[in-house]
A protein has these predicted regions:
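N-terminal signal-anchor module of multipass membrane proteins
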Residues: 1-55, 62, 310-313
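C-terminal ends of transmembrane helices
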Residues: 8, 56-68, 104-115, 200-208, ...
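Hydrophobic alpha-helical segments embedded in the membrane of multi-pass proteins
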Residues: 26, 52, 74-82, 97, ...
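Structural signature of hydrophobic alpha-helical transmembrane segments
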Residues: 40-53, 90-99, 181, 185-195, ...
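Long hydrophobic alpha-helical segments that form multi-pass transmembrane helix bundles
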Residues: 116, 121-198
Length: 315
């Protein structure tokens, strides 16, 4: 299906919107499945609660605003799923509900609904939760077999340090298995740890022409080059750690909040990669993907303005 893009607000036929949303949901299923494998029923509850709260909030908002019901476009389902995959496994469920309500009501419907929101709703909710529930959002439990990555034992079963925490300290000796980074047997948010599952999903979206390669490649390549020049930690660990892959492939590529031209997408991806590494290197929080993408969301209209081809004859 060939998609024609224009500057926001984006207006799509219902079928095109719902089909795109379904494709992204399908692409996230491998990562969701891995989260259940490593975390167990806690992941199932987080995903179910976030999706349910997002859908209910969408319905209530549309009724309150006296606008057409938009549940059928699956955008609320996708927002709930993305938010859940960006949450730590032991987060209290009421906090997940609060984040879902914020994502739909504040970050999306206040601006008029899908196509009008300037910032990615799931990332906006995650930023809100990091500020509001800092302790819960930065407490991690060990996945199955976590000792294969960090040497942790059953004594450490309640909480653990994520790879990004070790990377920020420069203590790469604690990270012993690249295979575990690829397969997801590491601490972190439930849907961000299995690089293979996320890359399979991204490949599916590219084949389906739902996204292009420009943002994911420029985002991750910028991170790699930055880490290469910075030294200290192997660049591949930066790319495979935290929310880099899920952010680059599934959040930075959001149609509504990202540039519309190939050149603009590359500029956007480079900006996301640079900001992510700057925040990781100099910020107080070891992760920077969410805030980097949100900052670049704000710059998207400017990028669109300067990267759109000029009409023939205009100087």
């Amino acid at each position: 299906m060939k998609l024609i893009l224009s500057s926001s607000p984006h207006a799509h036929a219902k079928n095109s919107v719902s089909s795109m949303m379904r494709d992204v949901i399908i692409a996230l299923l491998p990562a969701a499945g891995c989260s259940v494998w490593f975390v167990g029923m806690r992941a199932v509850w987080l995903i179910a609660v976030c999706i349910a709260a997002s859908v209910v909030t969408e319905a209530v908002c549309r009724i309150a605003m006296k606008r057409e019901n938009s549940i059928g476009d699956f955008s609320a389902v996708l927002t709930g799923l993305l938010l859940a995959l960006n949450l730590p496994p032991d987060l209290p469920l009421w906090m997940a509900v609060a984040g879902s309500v914020f994502a739909i009501a504040v970050a999306k419907q206040v601006f008029g609904g899908l196509g009008y929101n300037p910032f990615n709703p799931a990332l906006s909710a995650r930023a809100f939760m990091l500020i509001s529930f800092t302790g819960a959002m930065t407490t991690w439990s060990n996945p199955v077999g976590y000792e294969s990555v960090t040497g942790a034992t059953s004594v450490d079963a309640v909480t653990c340090a994520t790879p990004l925490m070790f990377i920020k300290k420069g203590d790469v000796s604690q990270l012993t298995s690249l295979k575990s980074f690829l397969l997801g047997n590491i601490g972190g948010c439930i849907g961000e740890t299995c690089a293979v599952a996320l890359l399979i999903g991204a490949a599916y979206l590219i084949v389906r022409k739902v996204i292009t390669w420009h943002i994911p490649v420029s985002f991750l390549a910028t991170m790699f080059v930055f880490a290469l020049f910075k030294g200290g930690v192997p660049p591949i660990l930066h790319v495979l750690s935290g929310g880099a892959i899920i952010g680059a492939c599934f959040m930075a590529t959001d149609y509504v909040t990202s540039p519309i031209t190939a050149k603009g997408k590359i500029v956007f991806g480079i900006g996301c990669g640079l900001l992510t590494m700057c925040i990781r290197s100099g910020g107080g929080y070891p992760e920077g993907v969410s805030f980097a993408i949100l900052i670049m969301n704000a710059v998207t209209p400017l990028i669109n303005r300067y990267t759109q081809p000029k009409p023939f004859g205009r100087k």
